Amino acid sequence: MAKKSMIAKNEQRKEIVARYAERRAELKKIIKNPNSTDEERLDAQWELNRQPRDASPVRVRNRDAADGRPRGYLRKFGLSRVRVRNMAHRGELPGVRKSSW
């Protein structure tokens, strides 16, 4: 099980990302637009750099929904590989079977 403080910090990052997402998208659009002037582009870059680091979606870590394990995360299930394996063996995941060939 992950430390509760790390899980809480990750949740806080998700909120910050959501809060700044729209403005970040606008600034990135200005920066990437070939029709914007150099000054507009520079101002947009400057404002983007002034935003908090945690506003970047890259800083959010995918974690197991059950216990917060940060590694071995499977997006399809929202769980770690260890938990998926245990749940599959117990038959708690519909449509998931142990492979055999």
UniProtKB/Swiss-Prot annotation:
Entry GO MF terms: rRNA binding; structural constituent of ribosome
Matches recorded under Pfam families: Ribosomal_S14
Name assigned to this protein: Small ribosomal subunit protein uS14
Gene Ontology CC annotations of this record: small ribosomal subunit
InterPro entries: Ribosomal_uS14, Ribosomal_uS14_bac/plastid
PANTHER family noted in UniProt: 30S RIBOSOMAL PROTEIN S14 (PTHR19836), SMALL RIBOSOMAL SUBUNIT PROTEIN US14A (PTHR19836:SF23)
Lineage start: Bacteria, Bacillati, Actinomycetota, Actinomycetes, Mycobacteriales
Family membership: Belongs to the universal ribosomal protein uS14 family.
UniProt keyword rRNA-binding, yes or no: yes
Organism name: Corynebacterium jeikeium (strain K411)
Quaternary context: Part of the 30S ribosomal subunit. Contacts proteins S3 and S10.
Superkingdom in the source lineage: Bacteria
The UniProt record lists the keyword Transcription: no
Function according to Swiss-Prot or TrEMBL: Binds 16S rRNA, required for the assembly of 30S particles and may also be responsible for determining the conformation of the 16S rRNA at the A site.
This protein's UniProt keywords: Ribonucleoprotein, Ribosomal protein, RNA-binding, rRNA-binding
GO biological process, alphabetically ordered: translation
